[in-house]
């Protein structure tokens, strides 16, 4: 008897599992609150050089600014430069100082803002960009973008650490570590007195939050039977969408970055308390030889699900026999993903797809400027559009297949980026429509990637394969904010980069085998039974056909 038979006896889907899904919903909601927080936390409002000495009774403010600030090529006043000396104005003497110093050339000299900046606080009372003594604008705007990169780099490192530690010490114990670490580091970030302190604490917060991404899914699915895992996975993914929309509301109500950071961090406190009711994975306990504790959790599951169990077939001795079969002989490594030709082909393609999915998703999600809506409306709309995109994925993977859905959603993302390049900056409505379409396609690509990748890898390497692709995906997420800095080279270059990477990932997805209506591979031999695809015709994995 294996673990699946044990789970069938105690109930693979019932009140016990539903309670578990509900208790693990909080981490899924917290993830987008932190991952997409830079939209509000690092927002850069309209700003200009601080210009002390403006006449208190000066009635023509715009004219006075014209004398002190140069204009950009698009006609707007510069945010980062001022004239070295005020320019002459009609009926004023503001230009006399300039003329007396011999500044008679056609192009007046300009200098950087030496006395700080003045910010428009109509939308944000404060962000890390406007923080006193930080001023992460103009020459320092790279540090503003780098804060997001540091955060996602922390997520990448944390994923590796939590993946190993949760296998070594258990899911529930490491989930507690993730909760406590996120709470402490989040509070420290909100109290940062310097940019360096903020960057360090946010990086460590990202590492702590990685525990949620690595632990919650296995802890939830390992208590579910095979039949209900897909339903539970789709249900759980809606919690992320709920967090995306909740962020818009929280950001609207709290305009100060320190209080906003506190608001998205403090829910970790009730999360810590909720762990009292979250069970450890019985499957993991059996692999570690903790038979007594696993037996206790299984009996509790049976009681909550109203399942009577036979004492003879469900004794601690019977569970011990199952444990002997569940013990891990050798832990797989990342190298196992590249040892055989077919598996190597799948791994290389999945790496490119996951990098493209994350790079384009976060590139689009973190860029809410230049649209016809304010940042709060845009974020709410971006969250709301994720719900129909999940329905699109559900229908498409059933009838068109996983491979075409993955390629099609990435192609749609690339086309949305490319079309936005053709729309002029004054066509706000069209820019908004294209951005929303791109967000829907990128979310659909993300959802498909999780399903498709898990079906490509054999059971013995599935967790390892998902770990590798998630690792590379987080690398793409960490580079996405930095790609936005390419606008200093050419204004359209960031969108061209995001779209180009998405297009490359779409083409790569077509090189993967189709898994629709195919049984999940169990061993490496199952995967290697057929050579890598050489055409774009639909292929079926060489296993028995099952109901989708």
Swiss-Prot record:
Membrane-crossing segments per the record: 21-41, 146-166, 180-200, 204-224, 234-254, 259-279, 346-366, 376-397, 404-423, 432-452, 466-486, 493-513
Matching CDD domains, A to Z? MFS_SLC22A7_OAT2 (cd17447)
* UniProt-listed PROSITE patterns: MFS (PS50850)
The yes or no answer to whether the keyword Cell membrane is present is yes
Keywords from the UniProt entry: Cell membrane, Cytoplasm, Glycoprotein, Ion transport, Membrane, Transmembrane, Transmembrane helix, Transport
* Cross-referenced Gene3D superfamilies: MFS general substrate transporter like domains (1.20.1250.20)
Pfam families in the record: MFS_1
What superkingdom does the record give? Eukaryota
**Glycosites:** 91
Reaction(s) catalysed (UniProt annotation): glutarate(in) = glutarate(out)
Task: For this entry, list what GO says about its biological process.
Answer: alpha-ketoglutarate transport; monoatomic ion transport; organic anion transport; prostaglandin transport; xenobiotic metabolic process
Q: Which GO terms describe its cellular component?
A: apical plasma membrane; basal plasma membrane; basolateral plasma membrane; cytosol; membrane; plasma membrane
> Is Membrane there in the keyword field?
yes
GO molecular function terms listed in the Swiss-Prot or TrEMBL record: alpha-ketoglutarate transmembrane transporter activity; organic anion transmembrane transporter activity; prostaglandin transmembrane transporter activity; sodium-independent organic anion transmembrane transporter activity; transmembrane transporter activity
Q: How is expression of this protein distributed across tissues?
A: Mainly expressed in liver and kidney. In kidney, expressed in proximal tubular cells. Also expressed in pancreas, small intestine, spinal cord, lung, brain and heart. Expressed in fetal liver.
- Enumerate the residue ranges of region (Disordered): 522-548
What protein family does this chain belong to? Belongs to the major facilitator (TC 2.A.1) superfamily. Organic cation transporter (TC 2.A.1.19) family.
Classification via PANTHER family: SOLUTE CARRIER FAMILY 22 MEMBER (PTHR24064)
Question: What protein name applies here?
Answer: Solute carrier family 22 member 7
Organism of origin is Homo sapiens
